[in-house]
Structure formats: structure tokens, C-alpha cells
Design a protein with these regions (language model features):
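A residue-level marker of the well-folded mature domains of exported/periplasmic proteins
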Residues: 1-171
Length: 171
């Protein structure tokens, strides 16, 4: 309504909302990150999806994790069980097992992308089960997983931004 030519939304959970707004302003163009426009309700013609190969980034994290693990157990903390998060985790587990077939991979979801204490608790549980590498795919919440890893002197791997400021055990 304000006359913008292009609007960009970010996040799988914004898909249906973006499609609904796009229908109301058909002269504006929309792009949404982490969503295939073909899967949107009503398939509005003024919306394009921007997809990434999350599994490939996850694969690199899996190779790094399997390489540095001394216990033979690595883990991942997802925010929610949604396609982009699951793609990161699938790549992580697949490539870790390709490199070291006997490696144990643990995974759990915090059900949150914001509350750091939830991801910290999930990560601490995984560390308690022997994980010495924690891969977080949980947005702001995941910083809690990285903090848990740093406080426990195990490796932490993050996504989306540089998280090295959280400790020296970051990959």
C-alpha cells in the first residue's frame, strides 16, 4: 500500500503470510527466503522463492565436526522441524557418516528460534550423552547451544552469522 516495488521476506514461517499480503498488492513484487513459491497457498504470481542448498553447508559442518570429534559422537540442535532446518541437519549427519561411518549423530529440537536457554538445555543434554561437537541450526536460540559448547569445552558450530565471539571452541 505504500508503493514499494519489491518486498523481501525472510524465513520459512513467513511463507503463508507473504502470500496473503502479495495477493492484496498484486502490483508489488515479493521474494521470500527459504520458501519455494510453488508451495505457497494460492501460488501468487508476484512472489518468488529464494532457496539455498542448506544441506551443502550442513555437509561442510558435518565434515568439520566428524574431523575434530574425539568421542565419536556429534550432535545438532534445530529450532523447529521445518524443511530448511532439516536440510542443514541432514547434510551434517550424512557427511559426518560418510567421513566416519561409525560416528553417532544426535539431534533434537528446541521448538524455538529465540530463547537461548532452550537451546542451551538441549545442547547440554547432548553433551551429557557424549557429544563433543554441537551444530546449531536455531537462529538466536542457537547462541545458547554455542554457549553450552564453549562452557563445556567442546566444539560449537553455528549458522547464519559468525559466532566466534562466543568462545574459542567455535568452528
Amino acid at each position: 500500500k505504500q508503493g514499494y516495488d519489491m518486498i523481501i521476506a525472510v524465513g520459512f514461517l513467513m511463507g503463508d503470510s507473504t502470500a496473503a499480503v502479495a495477493k492484496k498488492v498484486p502490483k508489488s513484487k515479493f521474494a521470500i527466503v527459504d520458501v519455494s513459491a510453488a508451495g505457497l497457498k494460492g501460488k501468487p504470481k508476484n512472489v518468488r522463492g529464494i532457496m539455498f542448498a542448506e544441506q551443502e553447508a550442513g555437509c561442510l559442518a558435518g565434515i568439520a565436526g566428524a574431523t575434530v570429534s574425539k568421542t565419536g559422537t556429534i550432535s545438532s540442535v534445530g529450532g523447529l522441524k521445518i524443511p530448511p532446518v532439516d536440510a542443514f541437519i541432514a547434510g551434517y549427519q550424512f557427511c559426518a557418516k560418510k567421513l566416519k561411518p561409525a560416528i553417532i549423530t544426535l539431534n533434537a529440537y528446541s521448538q524455538d528460534f529465540v530463547a537461548q536457554d532452550k537451546c542451551q538445555e538441549v545442547a547440554l543434554n547432548q553433551i551429557g550423552e557424549g557429544s563433543d561437537v554441537v551444530f546449531q541450526v536455531a537462529g538466536q536460540c542457537g547462541l545458547g547451544a554455542i554457549t553450552a559448547a564453549a562452557d563445556s569445552s567442546v566444539w560449537g558450530i553455528g549458522v547464519d552469522s559468525d559466532q566466534a565471539f562466543l568462545g574459542t571452541q567455535g568452528l
